Structures are given as C-alpha cells and as structure tokens.
C-alpha cells in the first residue's frame, strides 16, 4: 500500500489514539475504503452509490427519497463550493483526515476551530473544536 496515496501511518495513529467507536470522521473519497478496511468508520468511500439518498433514506409518496445526499455534500465540501463547517455541523463531524495538499486542508489548517492532532509527509488529522 502506497503511503503517498493511502493514510497508512495516520490510520495507525487514529486506531491507537482515538476511540473510533465515538468519532465521526470526515475523510476524502479516494482512501475511505482503506480506512474502513482497517476498522475506522468513514464519511465516504469508493462505493459512491451507497451515499446517495436512494440508499440511506425512504421513498416518499411523490417518488423522491428523503435520505441524505452524502456524496453531493462531500463533493461540494471538498471543492469548497460549500462552506465546510456547514457540512461538519450537519453530520456532527468530530475529526477530519485530509491529504496535506488538498484544497480543503489549505483552509482548515488556518482555521482556529480545528486542532491538528497528527501529521506526516502526506496526511493530517484534525479534531474539530466545537
């Protein structure tokens, strides 16, 4: 597994230092499956269809689904089309793991509402301070 593309060391740190049963982790799409495989609950992974409203809600009489559109929320948050704090509040996110070079990390790394807990050459883990 490539440590450049997957948060190998960050995942080990999370498993050793955080109570994974009691965190809500926002992660990026590309390595969500790796986190999940290692036993870390994720916001999203490569099974994008499972994060559409059709798979996490009920169908209303009008044919619309009432589930959350987690995939769209992820895309809009990661691209900064939506203010990240709105998404984090909506899903009660407690921790964030990001690639250091991500657009979202550029903003969060300068936001006093987040405490950097871990970083390595490629990834960073934050705690969201409410």
Language-model features: where?
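Extracytoplasmic
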Residues: 1-130
